[in-house]
Amino acid sequence: TIEKSDLSYGYYFGCVLSNISCFESDLSNTIFSNGEINNFFIKKSNIFGTSFTNTMIKNLLCEDIMPGRWTTQLVNKHLGYRYTGVFKTLASIDDKPSRFEILIPLVQTLVRDNVKLNNDVYKELNKFMHDYDKTSSEMRKYLKSINECMLLIKNIVHQD
């Protein structure tokens, strides 16, 4: 268990990590590369810019990955900045279910905090929400949440 720790800018190459719970910690810009992660639970932790390059992920669970209250300005800055933002994290995850373990609580948090997204951030988020195989058996458990989130994100875009 990792609790209230600063692991930002860490680098884990070729590691096999199993049964890890991470609470109220900073994982921002941490790199997991050429390894394997089994049963990783992240709660109330910062994952902006965390990268899972060439890493096999089995059972990533995320809950409240944007702890605290988030303002429109803060979210658009941290979410949209491609090199350190959460989109870098999502793009590095090949495993679609793991992506949605991050996307779904992310959208729910944005709605909770009444955040309005910049248009470019909205388009990018929308692209990730649509990036799944509707016939995949492992995606079926996410479909209801994905559809709900896609409806919700239409309400959080800045109307230019």
Where are each of the predicted segments found?
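Intrinsic low-complexity/IDR segments
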Residues: 1-160
